[in-house]
């Protein structure tokens, strides 16, 4: 499971180094293979270990090619999907179209989301955190059916 936010750098060749604490599980459980695609609701990227991505692909396979919305979803997620592999130094290459989609510059945030990572431009991440806090403070959590029993 992946959790926590890590500040990392994008090098001049378009690579990022995955933090050391995640490398071993990625190598052992997923042979170092990761699929990167776009987030369809935010200007960030999603990084899925290969076995998690295969679950997404199985769901995508069930979507219709004749329904405009379903086809659009498939085009976005699959059209941008790139499989990459950790190199010997724990780095992965982010293809240019993906870097452009998420407006990635030198400073990046890698954010664990249990079964996947989000990859954000650092400034966009800070703005997103502010928006998340406003959303949480502005909503009565007890009125949200899925969050009614959630407590910390």
From Swiss-Prot:
Q: Which cysteines are joined by disulfide bonds?
A: none
Keyword Membrane in record: no
Q: Which UniProt keywords apply?
A: Cytoplasm, DNA-binding, Repeat, Transcription, Transcription regulation
Q: Which CDD domains match?
A: MraZ_C, MraZ_N
A Pfam match: MraZ
Its subcellular locations are: Cytoplasm, Nucleoid
Q: Which GO terms describe its molecular function?
A: DNA-binding transcription factor activity; transcription cis-regulatory region binding
InterPro entries the record matches:
MraZ (IPR003444), MraZ_C (IPR035644), MraZ_dom (IPR020603), MraZ_N (IPR035642), MraZ_sf (IPR038619), SpoVT-AbrB_dom (IPR007159), SpoVT-AbrB_sf (IPR037914)
One GO cellular component this record assigns the protein to is:
cytoplasm
Domain named SpoVT-AbrB is located at: 5-52, 81-124
Q: Which family does it belong to?
A: Belongs to the MraZ family.
Q: How does it assemble?
A: Forms oligomers.
Name assigned to this protein: Transcriptional regulator MraZ
Tell me what organism the protein belongs to. Answer: Shewanella oneidensis (strain ATCC 700550 / JCM 31522 / CIP 106686 / LMG 19005 / NCIMB 14063 / MR-1)
The record's gene field reads mraZ
């Amino acid at each position: 499971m992946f959790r926590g936010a890590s500040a990392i750098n994008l090098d001049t060749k378009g690579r990022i180094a995955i933090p050391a604490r995640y490398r071993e599980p990625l190598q052992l459980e997923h042979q170092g293979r990761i699929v990167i695609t776009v987030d369809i609701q935010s200007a960030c990227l999603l990084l899925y270990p290969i076995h998690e991505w295969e679950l997404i692909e199985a769901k995508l396979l069930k979507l219709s090619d004749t329904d405009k919305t379903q086809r659009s979803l498939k085009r976005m997620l699959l059209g941008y999907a790139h499989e990459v592999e950790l190199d010997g130094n724990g780095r992965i290459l982010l293809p240019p179209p993906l870097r452009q989609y998420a407006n990635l510059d030198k400073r990046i945030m890698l954010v664990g989301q249990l079964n996947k990572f989000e990859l954000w431009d650092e400034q966009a991440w800070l703005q997103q955190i502010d928006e998340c806090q406003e959303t949480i403070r502005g909503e009565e959590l007890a009125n949200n059916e899925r969050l009614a029993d959630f407590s910390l």
